[in-house]
Amino acid sequence: MPRLSPFHSRTYALCRSYAWKEWAGYLAVSNYDRHSEREYFAIRGSAALLDVSPLFKYEVRGEQAAEFLAKMWTRDITRLPVGRVVYGCMLDEDGYLLDDGTVARLDEQHFRVTSSEPWMAWYQAYSRGFNVQIEDSTHRIAALALQGPSSLDILNQVVDDDLSGLRFFGARPTTSEGRPVLVTRTGYTGDLGYELWTAKQGALPLWDALVAAGADYGLEPIGLDALDVARIEAGFVLQGVDYVSARSCLTESRKSTPFDAGLGWTVKLEREGFVGREALCKKEEEGGVWGLVGLELSWPAIEAIHEEYGLPPHLGPVACRTAVPVYDRYGLQVGQVTSSTWSPTLKRSIALAQVKREWAKIGTELRVEYTVEFERRELPATVVPRPFFDPPRKTDTFGEAS
């Protein structure tokens, strides 16, 4: 039986579609209406509210908390200032990806870690010899993502401090109606946005305050389907879709390094001491095989194929997670699309794909398998820069920086 989020009484009442998914053991809304179009446009045009409580959350405390996390994550957490958040990934001893997530430094000896999967046993196994205490706070802390162009205006009406100066990937403790709330300027939409973390006892008052403040701004509660489209536009990878955790892989060929999955920017191989470094260095010295790229599919070709069948192309903002082959111009398979969608904002058909690195250069012409009426066809596709959508407001500071 799935666990219910602290916000379930609110999300359940609003979910007219009765479309739900299981997310990390929780019941989560797929889309509130029968289609996610309105929710998607709230992300890009006004403001959106998403329950992200199912994220796994860990409190790491102690004199050696920073050193411990610097060992467990690819980022040098010892250099992370108080009030800042960093994105990174965890590797196994063989240098393969286990998970990605964030680490927030709340004070000198207190960090909050988020991830897609549970890692308590993994942390405990590596914590021997470190003066740290690790708490699984997943079920104790409720979390909301407030995303979109109007998110700051709504947020400032709900919290008791002006957060206009909160920088991208900043963290600030504040209060809402006297209840403690941690606000981080983070999110999974690639837009201006914030995430709010509070004790589960304060979950419903926080939701109600945000909904009331957002009424004049077109705030919409959103589900995971709309989020999926937004994160592809932002070029963000999803664990279990764009790469598979090494812990879950049944064959070696399914495992990925950070460089294979487009997360190489989170790794500095010259930094010693993190789990998997030596093996990862060796793999890169031997020559890595894969890379993650953005693809733009030819829209005229999509129209032409559908015209043959007397069908219109589908333009709804619905993401596809079905892996399909990618070929070079000679018909040799060089990779696979992992996520794809029609982007209503960009008016382009876009995809994330894992391809062999020699075909990962911007501008490379490839072909993607495309199925219409159960018949497999091929479409021209071009390797393009990632992210596809990257508005300045995502990182702009709107007040005195903090």
Map each language-model feature to its residues.
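Acidic active-site catalytic centers that drive phospho-/nucleotidyl reactions
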Residues: 51, 100, 195
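Well-ordered mid-protein domain cores that form the structural environment of catalytic cofactors
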Residues: 71, 75-129
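Acidic, proline/glycine-enriched N-terminal capping motif
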Residues: 1-91, 96, 225, 292
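Conserved, structured C-terminal
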Residues: 1-16, 20-23, 28-31, 104-402
